[in-house]
Amino acid sequence: MNDVILAELKKIEEKENVKIIMAIESGSRAWGFASPDSDYDVRFIYIRRPEDYLKLEGIRDVIEWQLDDVLDINGWDLKKVLQLLHKSNPTVFEWCASPIVYYQTEEFEELKKILPDFFSVKKSLFHYWHMAETHYREYLKGEEVRLKKYFYALRPLLAAKWIVDKQVAPPMLFDELVSAELEPALLPEVERLLEMKKNLPEMEKGPKVHSI
């Protein structure tokens, strides 16, 4: 699949006349709890030609390339990324922390060096807490629950605890967050759910787990 993804990135550069400085995996594969039928959520950052940024009519700062059952590929202009970084947007930090990197350049390495200067504990904490609360309220109150929704609530909750405890951006990998922040009494149940999630289809449901 890596070769397929790299080939698609090359097509993007040629068709859009841009330079991609990094491409990573986001979503469940990068978090470490993908299902057998999970798609590939590829995200990239790109730079346009200098003259493109001087056009009076402006130009889109997002490229949406492919969305199907296998590949979900889209990217942001570096200008957009820097604007969001200035606001301490958590998505930028997550992209830059992904454990699955398909492609990167020296420009991306330089970008990563300045990340800590823009991290806001308050903004990031609110982001993850709100995400966890929303998933709990909308998806975890029924008697049957889609397995992945447990992790879409647990991961941001643990990320919020990480931020409170360490005052730095949380890691992408769910296992790292579990090791550092999960209450030991919940570990067996979470490990059981994680094993099920990794071996069952993406949309699989199960009885509500009341301990979580």
Language-model features, listed with the residues they occupy:
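A basic- and aromatic-enriched beta-loop-alpha substructure that forms the phosphate/nucleotide-
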Residues: 55-131
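Conserved nucleotidyltransferase catalytic core and NTase-mimicking acidic/glycine-rich helix/loop elements
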Residues: 112-212
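A structural signal for short, well-ordered beta-strand segments and their strand-loop junctions
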Residues: 22-25, 94, 163-165, 170
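Catalytic metal-binding acidic patch
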Residues: 27-68
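Short loop/turn segments at secondary-structure transitions that flank enzyme active sites
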Residues: 48-51, 88-91, 134, 159-160
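Short His-Asn-centered micro-motif
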Residues: 26-27, 74
